Amino acid sequence: MNDSCDITFKEKVNIFSFEYLKCIIFIISFDDDDEYVFTKKLYSKLVTTSRILEDFLDFHGAKKNKDWVFYREIAATIQHLALACYSQRHVLNRLMFYSFESDQQETFKKEAFDTLKIIQKSIKLAGSVALEEARRLDISVPDRGYDISFFPGISSDQQLDHNIDDFNARDKQKENLTRIATEFLEVVKEFDQFAFYERYDLKKIYELVPQHINEVSIRRYEMLIHNIQSSFDSYVVNDESSSQNLMLEQLRSHFSIVFHILQVLGRLLHFYERHLYDTGYKDVYKNVSISLSYLLDPNVLLDRAVNFCLFYAWKFLSSGKALASRILNENMETSIIEVTIPKDRGFHSRPSLLVAKIVQHYGGEVKMVVNSDVFDAASVLDIQWAGGKIIKEEIENVQFKGDVRALEDLKILASVNYGEDHMGKGIPLPKELSYLS
């Protein structure tokens, strides 16, 4: 391994800054009213050059040095804003290929483009400051920026033919779709805590961020959606042109767009929490934070994070719920079981709630059959209606038909008298039903 320690810090900072500053010179060459939208290749170059510069500066302790900390923070700012823009640009590039049943695509497209331009403008402002800092620190600045031809867009005048015919065994395909649709519905259910129907004002946003909405919580959902999409791409194959094939394309579109929106949201929240949010630091760090707030107004940043990113992430998750439920019900393994009713007290509140929670946990359709009448086993109210019929007609056994996964757990629940003793008091449930606790 070559030992390069004989190269001074001063010489190395020039090396690690060169391509970064060359990008900066290119992006600030455009007037504010210029309609040029940065390409993914440009964002990628900004990300890689700013990241390696930030790593270099961190290695040499720039975060603890009052002369170098601001140059380092500007590089980190450009990196995270460029990452957000890369994901946002990806969404806009792919929007025509997404398959949605939504009628709000044009509204989303306009808001997405406006948000991209806002962040792009902030990168330009940060770039100007980066150049000033480079000159203050006597860093060599390139004579010129890159030529615009170095950053072409990704589209061209043709699409390659789809000539690979993959096919999964139908039984395996059904199993995979059942699992993936269930996981998606679980995320939708959990993410529903963030649901809102009217745009938040700034007062409400500052109450939510970062106490309730923050980078850590959003990164978790980003990873969950990414795992579902990865599983879909690995184990589900669109085998032919059919109605189900269209549904699968629509489902994957929901995975993809939500994943990339959450990427943007995560980067914006990271920038706010790490660089703008007042965590009690004083003096140098406080001054750095104030300086960065001039590059991207915290009010604007949080408005876009919440009223654009969070809103549309929830919107696209919600619009995929019915589709995922349909795919689940068409592909899940089904069966029918017959079990006894709860002894002594019948289907009152506790047994009805436990039955409904089991069905809701798996997400697939399950019906409760009482003689010739059919009830929704996911509905506590429906089960209690059935309970009245059971008492009136002195019925001792009922049937459940539908999602075999839920039926297995319903058999376990019935075997312990639906979680209560003969007096109607709750008893411990088997470990297989621990998710009901």
Give the location of each predicted region:
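Short amphipathic
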Residues: 333-343
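Long, compositionally biased, glycine/small-hydrophobic-enriched stretches that function as flexible linkers
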Residues: 1-324, 424-425, 432-437
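Beta-strand/loop-dominated core regions that host nucleotide or nucleotide-derived cofactor-binding catalytic loops
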Residues: 393-401
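C-terminal basic regulatory modules in eukaryotic proteins
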Residues: 406-425, 430-437
